[in-house]
Design a protein with these regions (language model features):
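Internal, conserved structured core segments that host functional sites
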Residues: 105-119, 134
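Transmembrane alpha-helical core residues of multi-pass small-molecule transporters
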Residues: 20, 135-136
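N-terminal topogenic module of multi-pass integral membrane proteins
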Residues: 2-94, 100-106
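Structural signature of hydrophobic alpha-helical transmembrane segments
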Residues: 68-69, 125-135
Length: 139
């Protein structure tokens, strides 16, 4: 027989999960290297229809920091739903079988992770990166 989860229990679970994510974020920051992945742009080298210049690196994504941001966003979401200001709205949504807070958090954090995964697999062009983030967030 399973124990029923109460509102107070759910608040406690969210706080514990938030602390866990913060600890994971700190561990990732402490253990990560300075490995980065490039974000590039390609510009035309001449009139329309001609060739493109070689891609240039706009900036580099620090992988460890990006993973830490992903974990930090999740921790922040747990603390927000456990906060006095939003907990009532969170519980009302769950009672109505809706979890708006989690969907908003997932749309952002999963987009960060999907962009990082796409970079690891070789996607580096800024237009593609922005599109991937936007499409994923919109789902």
């Amino acid at each position: 027989m399973s124990k029923e989860i109460t509102s107070a229990g759910l608040r406690r679970i969210n706080i514990i999960a938030g602390v866990f994510h913060l600890l994971q974020m700190a561990a990732v920051l402490a253990l990560s290297s300075d490995f980065t992945l490039p974000i590039t742009a390609t510009y035309m080298a001449g009139p329309p229809g001609s060739t493109f210049a070689s891609p240039i690196v706009l900036f580099k994504t620090p992988v460890g920091l990006t993973v830490a941001i992903f974990l930090g966003l999740s921790a922040l979401a747990h603390f927000i739903v456990a906060s006095p200001k939003f907990f009532g709205r969170y519980i009302a949504g769950l009672d109505a079988k809706r979890n708006y807070f989690r969907w908003v958090e997932y749309s952002i954090s999963s987009s960060v992770m999907i962009v990082l995964i796409s970079q690891i697999t070789g996607v580096s062009e800024i237009g593609s990166i922005i599109s991937i983030f936007g499409v994923n967030a919109a789902m």
